[in-house]
Design a protein with these regions (language model features):
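Helix-loop junctions and terminal segments of transmembrane helices
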Residues: 57-73, 87, 152, 260, ...
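Interfacial segments at transmembrane-helix termini and the short loops linking adjacent helices
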Residues: 108-132, 299, 316-350
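Membrane-interface helix-loop junctions in multi-pass transport and translocation proteins
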Residues: 30-37, 154-157, 167-199, 366, ...
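Membrane-proximal transmembrane or re-entrant/amphipathic helices at the cytosolic face
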Residues: 442-517
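Interhelical loop/hinge segments that connect adjacent transmembrane helices in multipass membrane
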Residues: 1-4, 199-238, 277, 281-296, ...
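Hydrophobic transmembrane helix module of multi-pass membrane transport proteins
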Residues: 88-235, 442-443
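Transmembrane helical elements of multi-pass membrane transporters/channels
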Residues: 7-23, 189-197, 213-284, 304, ...
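Signature of the first transmembrane helix
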Residues: 3-69, 98, 102, 136, ...
Length: 517
């Protein structure tokens, strides 16, 4: 198995554990606390995600970009020093942020701050809620940095182990905390999931940390652009709609939209997590000036992700009418239409992560900042114009439209400015096969009309997708070879089945190559 494939699989395991922790926690909160309290927890978690980019200072992006770059160019000592240097910067930033937050609480009063954080639902236990908010922001900043650092160091096995332990800690703590202490207990459970990666981050800052002045300027410039981009991107990608829904429609609408987003995130996490090794690999190739290798890997990554994310997203949208109530309860059935819209379009946002990795590998974080600024302005405009009038569905369609705009800008930049090619024809073929798959799954759901139809719908959709790949000639010869090599890493029983499937979907391509000119 190639190093890139192994790292991608381990990165997917690590990210999958993180995604499952968030997903299972959201179900636990919904089942134990009810709709209004679920909205309050989702609102606080959104505030945490909004605050973290301010604390991070773009350092997570910098460590994930420059560590593999230095290692790819053979500068291992400089890489180790930079690792410790950036870890210290982040810890100092988090410490300063905690002090500033404490001063703000002292100035405005813990009750006022707690009421704002919970959207007015916190009447008691205001001090624990405020303290938890500060702990969550600092812990999430350290956690995000830790996983970016481990990806940059290409220690994906360690990342997977930490994520697995954190999954168990968070889910068990959220369940227990929700049952015993309500909203504050649930939030304490989320904080428990950040404990291990935070300790790892703190332990990484000890030792020599001096770096070359030229490198320091490059890293600082890159980090500052990423900082601005991450802050503005948070408005577009980190659920800014919750703020407007809370203000105009109340916590019940916040809960509905949060549940819709939770299912969307679950659907895209698997394919998206395979991109965890893309930035490190592209940056490493950039360090060797291997532009042809970068072009080939970019196109292959887009095709591979499209092959995975299209059937998953479209298929999930097809089964959501039965899946969502089965997971969260009938109280959340109003979230079904928004969830179907968000999941259907989420596939394109996953593909855009490959383009973002490419842009960062080429140190063009200035474009990420500029495009994020444009998206943030559109998100704020939609929040004031659409959400007050149309509620949850207005938030869903606004999110989709803005993300499509951002993706369009990114594709234009990759093609016109960077000179890379997007495999449009291959992506369209994969999309067609996935739509046929989703149609088959939807028919099963509509005919049976019961949660028991979900397994049947998944099997039918998968079968139609495999046949569709062969019919539309969607698998490229190079991708077929990649799939064949990948099957050899599986257990023997699974490897034989996977090899037969890979041979089936790529048979038409092979036959075409055997025909005489």
């Amino acid at each position: 198995m190639s190093r890139f494939v192994k790292n991608s699989m381990l990165g997917a395991l690590a990210g999958g554990a993180t995604a499952l922790a968030s997903f299972f926690s959201s179900i636990a909160v919904a089942r134990t606390l009810g709709v209004n309290e679920t909205g309050s927890v989702a609102y606080v978690i959104w505030l945490v995600w909004m605050a973290v980019p301010f604390v991070d200072l773009g350092l997570s992006s910098a460590v994930g970009r420059f560590l593999p770059f230095l290692q790819g160019s053979g500068q291992y000592g400089e890489s180790a020093h930079l690792d410790r240097n950036l870890s210290r910067r982040l810890v100092i930033a988090a410490f300063v942020a905690a002090i500033c937050a404490g001063m703000m609480v002292w100035l405005y009063g813990h009750r006022s701050v707690a009421e704002f954080l919970s959207g007015g639902t916190a009447k008691g236990a205001s001090t624990p809620l405020v303290v938890l908010m500060i702990v969550l922001v600092v812990g999430q900043a350290l956690t995000t940095y830790t996983y970016a650092r481990l990806r940059g160091r290409q220690e994906f096995l360690m990342a997977a182990r930490i994520a697995g332990v954190s999954l168990l800690l968070q889910v068990s703590a959220v369940i227990g905390g929700s049952l015993l202490f309500g909203i504050t207990g649930a939030l304490a459970g989320y904080a428990a999931g950040m404990l291990v990666p935070s300790v790892v981050c703190l332990s990484a800052m000890f030792g020599p940390a001096s770096i070359d002045r030229t490198l320091s300027r490059r890293v600082t410039s890159f980090a500052l652009y990423c900082w601005g981009a991450n802050v503005t991107s948070a408005i577009v990608w980190s659920r800014i709609e919750l703020f407007f829904l809370e203000r105009y429609w109340g916590m019940d609408s916040v809960a509905m939209f949060a549940v819709a987003l939770a299912l969307t995130q679950l659907a895209i996490q698997g394919p998206m997590l395979l991109t965890s090794a893309v930035l490190a690999s592209l940056a490493e190739k950039r360090g060797r000036d291997d532009l042809d290798g970068m072009r080939g890997q970019f196109a292959a990554a887009v095709r591979l992700l499209a092959a995975l994310v299209f059937p998953i997203c479209f298929g999930t949208a097809a089964i959501i009418p039965e899946l969502l109530p089965a997971l969260y309860g009938d109280k959340f059935i109003a979230a079904v239409p928004a969830a179907m819209v968000l999941v259907s379009v989420a596939a394109l946002s996953v593909l855009s992560t490959v383009a973002t990795s490419l842009v960062q590998a080429l140190e063009r974080s200035d474009f990420v900042f500029a495009s994020s600024l444009c998206g943030a302005a559109c998100a704020l405009a939609a929040g004031f114009l659409l959400i007050p009038e149309f509620g949850v569905m207005g938030a869903a369609f606004a999110r989709v439209a803005i993300q499509m705009l951002m993706i369009g800008l990114g594709c234009w930049f990759v093609v016109q400015r960077l000179g890379f090619t997007i495999p449009v024809v291959a992506v369209l073929k994969l999309c067609a096969a996935a739509l046929a798959s989703a149609a088959a799954a939807s028919v099963c759901i509509r005919i049976v009309g019961h949660p028991s139809s979900i397994p049947l719908a998944i099997v039918a959709g998968a079968a139609v997708y495999v046949v569709g790949l062969r019919v539309v000639n969607a698998v490229e010869p190079g991708d077929a070879a990649f799939l064949t090599n990948l099957t050899r890493s599986l257990p023997p029983a699974l490897a034989e089945i996977a090899a037969r499937l890979a041979a089936f979907v790529s048979a038409t391509k092979r036959n075409e190559r055997m025909l005489p000119p």
